Amino acid sequence: MHGVRVGARACFATHAGSEARVHPSRMPRYAELLEQLSQVRPLVGGRPLTLSEKLLYTHLLDPAVDLAGAGADASKVRGARYLRLGIDRLAMQDASAQMALLQFMTCGMSQSAVPASVHCDHLIQAFEGAQADLERSLDTQREVFAFLESACQKYGIEFWRPGSGIIHQIVLENYAAPGLLMLGTDSHTPNASGLGCLAIGVGGADAVDALTATPWELLAPKVLGVHLHGKLSPWCSAKDVILHLAGELTVRGGTGYIVEYFGAGLQTLPATGLATMSNMGAEIGATTSAFPYTPAMG
């Protein structure tokens, strides 16, 4: 990773600052997830669960309440009731992070309740070239970047300064891990799902829910299974898979669904290819995409 993450050392801060209380990146608590899964199974009548259901239900704050009366009928949950979920991590881009942080500041908390990060990339516009565009952004957006860094330092949020890289690549390389439930304030946040987590794009109000550990509510998605078999022909890439799917489903065909990929064909695709497929799932309106672990995820 060639980007630069700012912790204690100030870059654009308006004060000297102190040691940042930065949450470490963390792997999911797999033992706890498995324990909760064992509690969930009787609530759904012992029916087989899809991968996306396992990932969601193991993050329920109170499975006995949210799955009460569901039994083995999946239609009583999917698209029919709201799930109250605990979030593992939050990522915010610079344009949408401003209002989320301003709202968080009114909550009286000393730091973010979950590991979180802010990434300065959306306010850097392309005109001439990388260096010239970066310098122009530093000049025109200086106050915004100073506010974001100062707030991040105060509330224990990791700050990725201008020039660090694009939020989706940074999250994929540094924070995504199989089993996580992540939110991000960008519609293409599902890019991180390429490493086996569930990453979902949200608005600023939902980001504040995550920052304050307020139960995040999601209408239980329906599940759209995509069976991949064989391998891609020469000159084809993972992007062609999602482009074909988008052609079949159109721009709203995935609305309210998690697209869950399975089959031997997954073993032939790189993790970056899976990330591309999940990223572009936003173009069909999908909540996110889910992939089982493959060796390509490392």
Per-region residue spans from a language model:
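Mobile "lid/hinge" segments at catalytic clefts and subdomain interfaces of large enzymes
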Residues: 18-23, 177-298
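N-terminal mitochondrial targeting presequence
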Residues: 1-20
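Long, structured ligand/cofactor-binding scaffold of large enzymes
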Residues: 22, 26-29, 33-222
